[in-house]
Design a protein with these regions (language model features):
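Short hydrophobic alpha-helices and adjacent helix-cap/hinge residues
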Residues: 1-294
Length: 294
């Protein structure tokens, strides 16, 4: 497997060390793996990784100084995510940061290496942690808790276009316990609001185009975009299709709104990566995942 090492100089300072000091630095270096669910060609995802690295450096852990960072990209491919997670484990990481859809792969790959997750809808439903306040096992992190936001997004969609009676729910075709649970919440919230829902699982841009085009052929519709690796990777396509067919849309990710999407209601991914850096720093300093609440 081709290995990709994410090397960054934090602070812009290069120091020439004596050989003995270099050896000591290498001995003290800790290994942190970063497992991303999308592709390395996505500048907004790269920005989230950089936010994590920058924050970690502020906390005293810098690449090339006392830290060895490895980044792997899953490219919204479950088999690749699994392989990348297994490779990070084989390389002997001290801590793994895993995003969204990669978390189950990381969790399956190791029960001993501490894992910090980000952008995960519900680690209880998966199930991964057992308890928010006292996580069980080798994993903890930061959840987006999408369930509590569904009703807000539907309400916002109604505010954008009061005549809406139908909603197209666009999501990844990849299924899981959390995916199904979130779909049920969307259906329940929509019924309570007097809206009908068309579920649109997709696995490529053609699916997105087809689903939006067919749905937009009838009036009084709106688009609700799920927060997952697939919609994140193809957010520009989704934004363009919604605009082309004049479909009011609400996105779960702020990054989609930044791509000229009409409106979003969700968390700040870069900020969550910064917060995750504090957990990684504590784990590197000896804390256990069970000490760090979700």
């Amino acid at each position: 497997m081709k290995r990709r090492q994410f090397i960054g100089l934090i602070g812009g300072v290069t120091v020439v060390w004596p050989l003995a000091a270099r050896a000591q630095q290498l001995e003290r270096a800790r290994r942190v793996g970063i497992l991303m669910s999308t592709a390395e060609t996505d500048p907004l995802e790269v920005a989230s990784v950089q936010a994590f690295i920058t924050e970690l450096a502020k906390l005293g852990w810098g690449q090339g100084r006392n830290l060895d960072l490895s980044v792997r990209w899953g490219a919204v491919d479950s088999q690749r995510m699994k392989a990348e997670a297994e490779e990070l484990v084989s390389l002997g990481m001290d801590v793994i940061l895993a995003k969204g859809a990669t978390v189950p792969s990381a969790h399956q790959a190791t029960t001993t290496i501490p894992i910090v997750f980000v952008s995960l809808p519900d680690p209880i439903v998966e199930p991964l942690v057992g308890s928010f306040s006292h996580p069980v096992g080798n994993i903890t992190g930061f959840t987006t808790y999408e369930y509590g936001l569904v009703g807000k997004r539907l309400s916002l969609l109604r505010d954008l276009s009061p005549r809406i009676t139908r909603v197209l729910y666009l999501r990844s075709r990849q299924t899981g316990v959390a995916t199904q649970s979130l779909l049920e919440r969307v259906m329940e919230s929509a019924r309570a609001a007097g809206l009908s829902v068309t579920d649109a699982p997709a696995q490529n841009p053609a699916d997105i185009d087809r689903a939006i085009q067919m749905f937009a052929s009838s009036p009084d519709g709106g688009l609700l975009v799920a927060f997952d690796a697939f919609t994140g990777m193809h957010r520009q396509v989704i934004v363009e299709m919604a605009s082309r067919y004049r479909l009011p849309a609400v996105y779960a990710s702020r990054k989609s709104a930044g791509n000229d999407g009409l409106c979003s209601y969700g968390f700040d991914q870069d900020q969550q990566f910064r917060e995750a850096a504090s957990y990684v720093a504590r784990l590197l300093s000896g804390s256990k995942p069970s000490d760090l609440p979700v």
